[in-house]
Amino acid sequence: VTAGAGGEAGAVRLDAAIDDFVLYLTAERGFSPHTIRAYRTDLSGLASFAESRGHTTTDALGLDLLRDWLWSGTQAGLARSTIARHSASARSLTAWLARTGALPVDRGVRLRSPKPGRTLPRVINRTQMQELLDSLVLRAGHGEPAALRDLAVIELLYASGLRVSELVGLDVGDVDLDRLTVRVTGKGSKERVVPFGVPAQGAIVDYLRRARPALVAAGSPADDPGHEPAPPSAPTALFLGTRRTRLGVRAVYRLVASLLVEFPGAGPAGPHALRHTAATHLLDGGADLRAVQELLGHASLGTTQIYTHVSAERLKQSYRTAHPRA
């Protein structure tokens, strides 16, 4: 960290301090790459805002500047949830700067977050989910490797409620096909063991036997049949893309979005919709809330409780549809 011109004695450049903070989050807190990117994006925005006000050092991080930054986001039309995340990122930074002596006190401790409006997550109903899976089974019946992989991906997402980042991070050795469990590394590098069902087991077995070897072999030099193909760049990855690399988050997003377009509804049509669907269907079926919390890897029970609201809304909808006095 280097001293900044024009600031108080001992002040350091804000951009350098942010770099050090991000390094701390990566090396010591073990945050996921997705979380690290979010912090860096948020705090780079803060640094740019401070620079637009003529400030480039950490001594400028007063409560007024931080509030002005959040207000500028509100005026720009950012969602309340985004403003709340910006506030949390700024508070984490100022707390760390105070602990490391770069700030005399934590100036962000009184920074308030707007309460994000409660938005019920998108859920696919059981009939639609069955139709979606049936269409994938039919497509996989032709034996095309990508179709077999896609079926295994969707079956596992729905069966386990994994985050998409957790799914693409799986290695072959993380899956126990005898015990029907998968070992997952979630947020904060926390490990948990998540169960899945027989349909997902069958889809994964088919993928491993019939599709993954073909994906590993794909791309070997066609003009030299005797040439040994180079090993895949992610040899341990459970799910491979068409170029023998680990299947990426964007590829899974595209897959799920293309499937959910057949079932229009409120909310984003991404992999998280399958996570929401898995949680809601579990609660609809009588699963214990704390068991669902453990399955999803939520640190707080309050995060899981939103799915009880989804179940209640679905009950109200069924009541209004079916009861003559509704």
Question: What does each of the following model-derived ranges do?
Answer:
Residues 1-326:
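Conserved catalytic core of the tyrosine transesterase superfamily
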